[in-house]
Amino acid sequence: MELLERATPLPLAAAHPGVTVLALHGRMWRATRADGAVLGYVELLDTAEGERFLSKRLRPRAQGFLPVGEFWTADEAIESLRA
């Protein structure tokens, strides 16, 4: 069995009012609204250009995720989930 990395806070440079971010494991976070509704997820990726943050939503009634976009900062990834 593969061990998951220890959960760490998402490296946000700014506050995101109305959004709560919960670390799921070392490279994945869940973003929720104040009412508990899940906005989506942010995953840290290693790419040839450096680290990127992938924002994605869980697909309703289907398995897997729908990518929203890849971003250079965690703040951009969180903001993309507000739309």
For each predicted feature, which ranges?
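A broad, structure-centric signal for solvent-exposed, well-ordered loop/edge residues
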Residues: 8, 28, 38, 49, ...
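Small-side-chain structural scaffolding
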Residues: 31, 40, 55, 69, ...
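Negatively charged, low-complexity tracts enriched in Asp/Glu with abundant Ser/Thr
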Residues: 1-34, 63-68
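Short aromatic-glycine-(Arg/Gly/Cys) micro-motifs in beta-strand/loop hairpins
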Residues: 39-64
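A short, charged, amphipathic alpha-helix used as a generic interaction element across diverse proteins
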Residues: 60-63, 69-83
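Intrinsically disordered, low-complexity sequence elements enriched in Ser/Thr/Gly/Pro
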Residues: 4, 28-31, 50, 55, ...
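Compositionally biased, intrinsically disordered low-complexity segments
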Residues: 22-24, 45, 81
